[in-house]
Amino acid sequence: MKFTLISSCVALACMALAVEAAPSGKKINVPLSKNANYKPNAKRAIEKANAKYARFRSSSSSSSSSSCGSAGTESSGSVPVTDDGNDIEYYGEVTVGTPGIKLKLDFDTGSSDLWFASTLCTNCGSSQTKYDPSQSSTYAKDGRTWSISYGDGSSASGILGKDTVNLGGLKIKNQIIELAKREASSFSSGPSDGLLGLGFDSITTVSGVQTPMDNLISQGLISNPVFGVYLGKESNGGGGEYIFGGYDSSKFSGDLTTIAVDNSNGWYGITIDGASISGSQVSDSFSAILDTGTTLLILPSNVASSVAQAYNANDNGDGTYNINCDTSELQPLVFTIGGSTFEVPTDSLIFEQDGNTCVAGFGYGQDDFAIFGDVFLKNNYVVFNPQVPQVQIAPISN
């Protein structure tokens, strides 16, 4: 599930993209937008991430790395995503049904369900767009129910159905959808209408459900089983995109580094070989999850403590740290992954500022693995391949 703070958004135009695809291939573009009224809250972001993984608390993920490589494709779709607030969440427009209704959905590699507000919902937010199954000629009943709850007490539940899902021009037929009949206020008061999970199908709420990515592959809508993720920074105007079936080589510099994925827990788990600051190592290897649905960079407590010590950051006792507000006195946080190095630059080390007090973009959670959320991902382009499985990472272009 994608966990974010509540905020509204302002639409932002997206730019044309150079996608790695054959000339006849399609592009699906999902633009990002920013919210000028958003006020970040690092403590709440940590709480949400802890709640997200509470039901998997005993799990951890790890993997070995492999050699460098790149991916091409003959058919692809590009979905622009909206950057809400201070890079707190990213969502894209997805069309569901016939005639289609446009829904704003969180794109989340840390979960695998496709669910959204519906006209059957008794407590969904008044500002949410609600899918009406009675108005779609391609809707079919399923008969099953779904329910999901998180460690912070939030939950959502409803019924399953089938309908056509248009993902940036790629029409998925008979996609299982989860229609919310009830949802917690943390969802109903948010800027999005639901969630599109991009994790592995082993962690869908209802067993045996195929994810949208599964169906893009099985229905032959994409020939290359990958999706490329670019998350723009609010400081640079926001923006971003998901490309299904390919990636955008103009968005990163250098070569893609290929890293093996451990998907035994349903996530994109990788091994981080180490972390350093100013050339000094601050951590040995540890496991991490690449999660577009988490805002911050959440580290195991021992790793976070070492990183904080190097920055003279003070522990607030709630998973967050106060850090020096002067970025000129900070150095990038560098991770070695698959034999290559990837940075979290100094401008991303500060997430929240209130006067002379700054809260860091990194923190610690309740798990023995790290969650590499948007603080890392907005600085590094990632190509996800669920079939191998593997990811490919490169620094974003300046």
UniProtKB/Swiss-Prot annotation:
Entries under CDD domains matching the protein: Aspergillopepsin_like
Keywords: Aspartyl protease, Disulfide bond, Hydrolase, Protease, Signal, Zymogen
Top EC class, one word: hydrolase
GO terms, biological process: proteolysis
Catalytic activity: Hydrolysis of proteins with broad specificity similar to that of pepsin A, preferring hydrophobic residues at P1 and P1'. Clots milk and activates trypsinogen. Does not cleave 4-Gln-|-His-5, but does cleave 10-His-|-Leu-11 and 12-Val-|-Glu-13 in B chain of insulin
Low complexity: compositionally biased ranges: 58-78
Positions of region (Disordered): 58-83
Presence of keyword Hydrolase: yes
Keyword Disulfide bond among record annotations: yes
Cysteines joined through disulfide linkages: C121-C124, C325-C358
Family (UniProt): Belongs to the peptidase A1 family.
Propeptide: 22-74
GO molecular function terms listed in the Swiss-Prot or TrEMBL record: aspartic-type endopeptidase activity
Active-site feature positions: D108, D291
Domain Peptidase A1: 90-394
Its EC number(s): 3.4.23.21
The protein, known as: Rhizopuspepsin-4
N-terminal signal peptide: 1-21
SUPFAM superfamilies the record matches: Acid proteases
